[in-house]
């Protein structure tokens, strides 16, 4: 049973990828050169054997270098086009919608009724947060107690 079927996934030893995982040269295909798809392509490359520690220790450095080069390549292309596109550019996600932070920003911040309301609600929120922080324990006490709890449970487990 040491020989595998010729059609099996593992028969080739993992060398039948269209691009090897340590091929660090910047790609020129449209999927990774487009800054909108850059997040997808780099996270896709991280999957597989690299996330399960099946490769030697120095190969993680090589694959990380490749991801950086891919990002640099996309940035260079944006500069050649004359900056980012008007419709949001790299800030947009895959479906062309802006991310939540950009969506919530108001274009005209100088309108007086908006700024006064905004600062008022922000001030109220911080006041409430201060009240709730005064009631709770300090971080030092919390961490001390959690360490004690851990130690006690370890001692209980030993017995």
Curated annotation (Swiss-Prot):
Compositionally biased intervals (Polar residues): 9-31, 105-119
Pfam families (alphabetical): SMG1_N (PF17229)
Naturally occurring in which organism (per UniProt): Homo sapiens
Region (Disordered): 1-139
Name under which the protein is recorded: Putative uncharacterized SMG1-like protein
InterPro entries: SMG1_N (IPR035175)
UniProt feature, compositional bias: Basic and acidic residues: 65-82, 125-134
């Amino acid at each position: 049973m040491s020989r595998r079927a010729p059609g099996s996934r593992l028969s080739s030893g993992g060398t039948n990828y269209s691009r090897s995982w340590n091929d660090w040269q910047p790609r020129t295909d449209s999927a990774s050169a487009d800054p909108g798809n850059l997040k997808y392509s780099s996270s896709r490359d991280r999957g597989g054997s690299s996330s399960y520690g099946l490769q030697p220790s120095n190969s993680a450095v090589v694959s990380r270098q490749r991801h950086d080069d891919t990002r640099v390549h996309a940035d260079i292309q944006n500069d050649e086009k004359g900056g980012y596109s008007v419709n949001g550019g790299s800030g947009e996600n895959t479906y062309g919608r802006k991310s939540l932070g950009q969506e919530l920003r108001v274009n005209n911040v100088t309108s007086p009724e908006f700024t006064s309301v905004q600062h008022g609600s922000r001030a109220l929120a911080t006041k409430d947060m201060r009240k709730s922080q005064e009631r709770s324990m300090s971080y030092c006490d919390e961490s001390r107690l959690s360490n004690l709890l851990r130690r006690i449970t370890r001692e209980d487990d030993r017995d």
